[in-house]
Amino acid sequence: MKTAIIQLPGLNRDQDMLVALHHITGVEPIKIWQTESTIPDVDVIVIPGGFSYGDYLRCGAIGARTPVLQAVREKAQKGVTVIGICNGFQILLEARLLPGALMRNTSLKFVCREIKLEVVNANTRFSRYYSKGQIIRCPVAHHDGNYFVDNETLKQMEDNEQIVFRYAENTNPNGSIRDIAGIINKAGNILGMMPHPENFIEPAHSGTDGRLLFQSALELTNG
């Protein structure tokens, strides 16, 4: 299985993602720099977390307007699987590849801790190896993770089952509407989420709850 990791100035979780994907697939991901206007044939494209371009203007605003993001858009339109984690999620929202926006945490503080997620929709290419209602552990590390969307769009998302993960058991770290932690687009091939599943893929690193997300996306057997 071939994977690609998008690299932008200020993204600092690319190495974490590379280690995770390499560990799961046995194949080292391709790194795609910001100035690239094409992306080779791959099965999954990942935009990792960090602080692209120093979060100037808005988190993800500059990153969403780079040549490589246009290439990501073109691949996504062809049905290629795309995952945006944390700042990657912010970039996907700024690029209008996903609905809604991410605002400053209601605490006005950077939040870095382990939280619990509820699997809301287990019938997606990202969650098929989980069970609906399953509670999983995952870390968060962000300052602007407060997801917001207007009521009309929220209803459409709920009707379309686009909400994949929610913060569970009063663990919402940022004030996100309806405790939303991860969503997909209508076509179901783009996932954006604030938590970092790439950090929970080995038992020695606090657990393996994040591993199934990548195995699901890559259609790898659960094992």
UniProtKB/Swiss-Prot annotation:
Transmembrane intervals: none
Alphabetized CDD domains for the sequence: GATase1_FGAR_AT (cd01740)
EC number(s) stated in the UniProt entry for this protein: 6.3.5.3, 3.5.1.2
Keywords of this entry: ATP-binding, Cytoplasm, Glutamine amidotransferase, Hydrolase, Ligase, Nucleotide-binding, Purine biosynthesis
Keyword check for Nucleotide-binding: yes
InterPro entries membership: Class_I_gatase-like, PRibForGlyAmidine_synth_PurQ
UniProt cross-references to Gene3D superfamilies, sorted A to Z: 3.40.50.880
GO BP: 'de novo' IMP biosynthetic process
Catalyzed reactions per annotation: N(2)-formyl-N(1)-(5-phospho-beta-D-ribosyl)glycinamide + L-glutamine + ATP + H2O = 2-formamido-N(1)-(5-O-phospho-beta-D-ribosyl)acetamidine + L-glutamate + ADP + phosphate + H(+); L-glutamine + H2O = L-glutamate + NH4(+)
Active site residues per record: C86, H196, E198
NCBIfam families xrefs: FGAM_synth_I (TIGR01737), PRK03619.1 (NF002957)
Biological role: Part of the phosphoribosylformylglycinamidine synthase complex involved in the purines biosynthetic pathway. Catalyzes the ATP-dependent conversion of formylglycinamide ribonucleotide (FGAR) and glutamine to yield formylglycinamidine ribonucleotide (FGAM) and glutamate. The FGAM synthase complex is composed of three subunits. PurQ produces an ammonia molecule by converting glutamine to glutamate. PurL transfers the ammonia molecule to FGAR to form FGAM in an ATP-dependent manner.
Subunit text: Part of the FGAM synthase complex composed of 1 PurL, 1 PurQ and 2 PurS subunits.
Protein name: Phosphoribosylformylglycinamidine synthase subunit PurQ
Organism: Bartonella quintana (strain Toulouse)
